[in-house]
Curated annotation (Swiss-Prot):
Residues 215-325 form the Glutaredoxin domain. It comes from Arabidopsis thaliana (Mouse-ear cress). This is Uncharacterized protein At5g39865. PROSITE patterns: GLUTAREDOXIN_2. Gene3D superfamilies: Glutaredoxin.
Amino acid sequence: MGCASSKNRNRCRNCKGGLSPVIVPRSYSMHVHHPAQHTGDSYHTVALTSSTIGSLSLCDSSLRHFHKHLEDSFYKQRVSDQMGEETLISGNGFLHGDEEKMNLDLQAKVIEAKVWSSTINEKIPKIVAKTPIVTPPGEPETINTWELMEGLEDVSPLRSPNHLRSFSFDFVRIQPSHDHDHDVAVSFDLPKSRFHENVKSSCRVDDLDPPDIVSRFKRKTLGKERVVLYFTSLRGIRKTYEDCCNIRIILKSLGIRIDERDVSMHSGFKDELKKLLEGKFNNGVGITLPRVFLGNKYLGGVEEIKKLNENGELEKLIKDCEMVEDGSPGFGNECEACGDVRFVPCETCSGSCKLYHEGEEEDEGVTEYGFQRCPYCNENGLIRCHVCCE
């Protein structure tokens, strides 16, 4: 009648209700039937909704039954459209039956996996740690040292009982002979070396070494002079520092012992150099480094030493100088005590240049008490290295 459509709406054949996609709920529910498993059990029905599926813990016996009902839950409704044709749709009223079936299959598999995982975890036995935590009770063991030392004697069977040991050497005790025979007494003397085989017991050192040999050896030892090098280790002036390094390399290559005196580490060396060169310079003014001396004889500076080395005269001048032994500091080896610095901190004041004298102490030569200047080190609290600067 009027402008309204008089065409009847599609109705469901089962419930005779109108089909409208607007009023269809988004969640679905299903009925799961649980038959009686034991005598006396009742037949009951459980309604499952989409929000509860996945949160229930199922036992292994009802797993297959639940999966079967999930497949049967897709009941189909026949809907007649305006043309009179019937269409099969799923239970929620929409035309997406395949997607909902896939979702339910996935949920069933997830539930089945959870059930199997929980079952496996229950069957796996828990391993208990076998390491003991508490110390077992018991009395401490007593060790008898006398039993362990039994059989060990002070005298070894491989060593004579008359063998004595000193701190630095071994010797054998010789039993005194009660026989007055001279030949037997001589047989107990220490063995002589080959050098003394043909020498009489009454000979003296003067008979072996003539006096002229001893005097020549003493004169040769005392007559050796050292090469004294005055230099600086400061790098403020680059040319001066490089000249000092070059002269040190030239002198060390000759294998002689050098008395290196660093004027930057000890002001006393600077005063010595001024006193030695006051005749060559204007009262020691304008002295440059390095400077080389052979004893008290002045050899020259950097230019003179280079020229003497190139001409071969430097090696002739120092032929009587003391040579450096192999492996000792100065022969290409660094001093282990000072590291080729030639100075070490003072052992008395530890480099502080101060000593404290208490009034109660009665030291010889101490007239004042309190903090005093250390008399053993220089102005920098350093002393000469006792290893390489003997």
